[in-house]
Amino acid sequence: MVSGTVDHIGLAVKDIEKSISFFKEVFGAELLRKNVVEEQNLISGVISLGSINVELMQSTKDNSVIDKFIKKKGEGVHHISIQVGDLDRFLGELDSKNIKILNKLENSDYKIAFIHPESAFGVLIEVIERLT
């Protein structure tokens, strides 16, 4: 078993600027970074709320994952992200337990994979290994 810690909570939003302003004004959140994630067709804004980070995600393209999510379920919690030390090893353990993985992505900063909600009590879980 690989132990993990909560990395962040992901929220799907229609307007990232409005949502960043809300968390800053209401909760005193600090914007850590904001960037376009082209391979996922979204704008990501990560804010700090004390000991937890929240990723705000706005779609940049019709029919992207976030666009479809919002059309189907509305704005709200999209995923919980759990950080592990070795994603490939962890995925091997999941495979041996017949836990369904949706997809895996990698860039210079991190490797991520998503555990299908069917395998995780209706929750989309992002598993992340930070490389930097």
Enumerate the language-model features and the residues they cover.
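Conserved acetyl-CoA-binding loop of GNAT-fold acetyltransferases
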Residues: 25-31, 98-100
